[in-house]
């Protein structure tokens, strides 16, 4: 290490400019523990290690320059080179003071950054060869200026939040124009972690270093903001608690002076409420036991609040209060007819219940389940039943319920526990014999918390529900006098054990005539009232309502019909509000003006008799539909293609129909070798709509026989029925909806299975007069009615297979 020519006699040398500094290549190294020194930073250091003191002495004996580098571990007394950061700062020792305990205090000023290239000597102190780090000159542009201004603002904000920043530093920052110097000054005054401070020291680009400082300032600002919020909240809470404690103590003192014991009065009120609640003996015994526990507790304890809530529930649950049933059958029938047209099966069942109840007062309530499509009146029917019986009505929706505790409640050990939906509904009703509706029963779910449908088994079992146990109440409750009414759109999702406990009443969709009558009697008056209209403002023609039903709604229920009627009423209300004086008459021609273009067009009827095209009947979630089942043949190597998104059951129906045809090929004059040389393609239009079900078997067989024998099928004949390998026609479901679809499509004849003859009782006589319904037992009877010629004549020549007509069907899920 070179020595200065001039001997230093003062401890505070004159600092020269950075460009005038001559930094020696070899310098003594002073490892520092818990601080990072930046250029131009002035800081006092306490030196206690013998090796470090010798390094300071060596620097003072020369040009006072020393290399400062931070060691990784502050507790390491003798750090090896690999435990010292290789980037540090060359500093000038400005002052030195020897302390009585042998340590040395020095005041140093950082000069320039440098990197340790190698360790030259290790004894008696570390001597290192350094490489000076020259920073690139920052470009003076708007982005740099904006960054520096942002940093100043960030620093001012954290100073306002309580960060100790020297006022002198704030003044210096206002005059600094170099981003690197600004970054170093802030970093040295921010109190950063050792790793963060070292990381900033090692960044050579001044703009990038200042950007990192800005990020650290933003983090510090956010941390100080959160800290201030926590301190304010704690201060407020402490003040609030102290105030409450002071007021509570004052209140206790005042109550003692007045002889007022509010807690005892509350307990006495609870005791009286328990005695007047007419609880069963075992329930009253448990309530008094819990009241005794409450009396022995401090009023402010958490357990006391739990017991008090539990006692409130026991008092409010109706243990013995009932409403007196209205057993007037004539009155009940009148109420049911007022609220709902048709639905005769449901009304008949309720009147039967009233009749039996009149003869046997101890009869338990039935458990009914209404199954039908949306909008047919299942939920509103429950309200009518309650009104007819003079009972309270309570409804809970089970759609989306996935937790058993929703039905049975939570045990009282859980924080915020409450009874389940059943007990809550009974409390809401206020009597022990309400009409209790379990809506959307088929929408129940289940997960790892349990299966709520299993919890309903006890509720809906007349043999068990006289002692229903809720987890929260934990006492038997009698539900046997409750008239449970469940509703569902489909019966398939309901578990069989639960389904078996209920009396299922199917509510099919309405015919167009029924919808028309309901619209005239109920929907139009209700929508006129809801929209503030009177008879002098609007009148609906019957043909206009038919137009709305036929072309603007396609559903089994009435919701869309009421919605469209309401849409017309709103438009009329607007015209009246705008000053229209005359009565507005809604005619069929005016419907399109109010509602726009028709939403549903009739495309079910074919133009002529065609080969290989049959009118099948299907049931959908919105009622019945006519399906045009098409078949064609082509040259090939045998085989059959099925298209139209057919389900497995429908595909098997086609296979069964083809097997029957091949086994009876001679009757239809079909050469057995034909199936080896040709291919068959069966298609059901509306290919985007999934279709499944066995009831298209007859239609499939008829289409195949027609295309194989080239005998056309009558265009005005529709059919439904499953086919067996022996040619038997088997029964199907949804007959009313399917016949309604046939009538709507203009069919003149509907072929149904003989075993469905009993279901004709449910079909209105008016509908049966519009179409000829023919029950059949075998496929030969179907062919005789559906084909133009039967028996099949022998072919005279080879004919080209007929090209089926493609018909576009509405997009909805279809079950044949």
From Swiss-Prot:
Question: Which SMART domains does this UniProt record tie to the protein?
Answer: AAA, LON
Its job: ATP-dependent serine protease that mediates the selective degradation of mutant and abnormal proteins as well as certain short-lived regulatory proteins. Required for cellular homeostasis and for survival from DNA damage and developmental changes induced by stress. Degrades polypeptides processively to yield small peptide fragments that are 5 to 10 amino acids long. Binds to DNA in a double-stranded, site-specific manner.
What's a Pfam family in this record? Answer: AAA
Protein name, please? Lon protease
Q: Which family does it belong to?
A: Belongs to the peptidase S16 family.
**Comp. bias regions, Low complexity:** 800-809
Question: What top-tier enzyme class does this entry carry?
Answer: hydrolase
Q: Where is the active site?
A: 695, 738
Which part of the chain is the Lon N-terminal domain? 27-221
The record ties this protein, via NCBIfam families, to:
lon (TIGR00763), PRK10787.1 (NF008053)
Please name the source species: Trichlorobacter lovleyi (strain ATCC BAA-1151 / DSM 17278 / SZ)
Identify the InterPro entries for this entry. AAA+_ATPase, ATPase_AAA_core, Lon_bac, Lon_bac/euk-typ, Lon_lid, Lon_proteolytic, Lon_Prtase, Lon_prtase_N
Q: Where in the cell is it found?
A: Cytoplasm
Q: Which reaction does it catalyse?
A: Hydrolysis of proteins in presence of ATP
SUPFAM superfamilies attached to this UniProt entry: P-loop containing nucleoside triphosphate hydrolases, PUA domain-like, Ribosomal protein S5 domain 2-like
**Superkingdom assignment:** Bacteria
User: What EC number(s) does the entry state?
Assistant: 3.4.21.53
Self-association or partners: how does it assemble?
A: Homohexamer. Organized in a ring with a central cavity.
Q: Which gene encodes it?
A: lon
> Locate the Lon proteolytic domain: which residues?
608-789
What processes in GO biological process is this protein linked to? cellular response to heat; protein quality control for misfolded or incompletely synthesized proteins
A Gene Ontology molecular-function term? ATP binding
Inducing or repressing factors:
By heat shock.
Single GO cellular component term: cytoplasm
